[in-house]
Amino acid sequence: MASCEVVITGLGIVSPLGIGREAVWERLRAGQSGVRRIPYLVEAGFPVTIGAAVEGFDPRQYVANRKSLKVMARDAQLAVAAAVLACRDAGIAGAVDPDRLGVLLGADRISNPLETCEPTYRACVIEGRFDYRRWGAEGLAATFPLTFLTVLPNMAASHVSIALDARGPSNTLHHGDVSGLLAVVEAARILQRGTADVMVAGGTSSQFTPFDWARHWIMGRLSRREEDPAAAMRPFDASRDGEVRGEGAAAVVLETLTHAQARGARILARVLGWASAYCPPPQQPTDPGLARAIRTALEHAGLEPSEIGLVSAQGAATVDDDMREAHALA
């Protein structure tokens, strides 16, 4: 079974706390927060003006083909950066056959920025009202031809594969908040099946358009605690009142143990066990699926709960979500 063991040898992070794992770790240790006021939300008069944005990010530092930036949503740009950083961290340049290098990413829904949608909207408006009958002719004619390529969830993985010259397995998982974790799991399975020697896996999301903010506000999921942005989101706290929207991407380099040892790689972690399960609708007070997934993952890893040193909970900071998660962890 040693040849089937999967290890992690590289990590790349692009987050509101910084770019690169060293920067993020230092700010975590210092107790810093990536939540702050978002200028365009303040200017637009949104009822919620705080968020966690990635600052100081220049995609041109990570995307070699500058022309491709025109058809890359921010989600894809963040994903490419995280993947490039992970591969640098792992030192796999020239150490892996491109045909045996794969990519698997978890992706979120992608919304077009307002500047892309505005020409289409204006072409369909008559006396202040959107006329759907004009969409097929005037609306499409005013739309940038490659717009739809930017919002396809699988485009992030495609751009990462191109950036890394990864010619092995490539796929995208779109399962909400667990997409990135499931991508890591499926990447490990691909390695164990012998289809690849190295996989780059992770997740990316940038829900920072006005459409995204408005949707989550209407759903009642956003914290209204504006006076102290850093303390607005309070997972599992009695005073929690909602989440804070953010953006970011993370990627890990996974390898079979034999491949990592053969090239003298630094091993950061081992992938021991995993599980997933169906979760009931969010209106339910408990989540037996989450509890079952936790138990099954421990069994798969051959571990007891007492052997776990860290639980990385979702901690959505909504009243119902935190209650269901706390019940499952108990």
Regions found by a protein language model. Name each.
Residues 6-8, 100-104, 196-201, 233, ...:
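Short glycine-aspartate micro-motif
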Residues 12-14, 107-110, 175-179, 203-208, ...:
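Acidic, glycine-rich active-site loops and adjacent beta-strand->loop/helix elements
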Residues 79-93, 153-164, 170-205, 244-265:
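Active-site-proximal alpha-helical scaffold in enzymes
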Residues 125-143, 185, 189, 193, ...:
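Glycine-/small-residue-rich "gating" segment that lines the acyl/pantetheine channel
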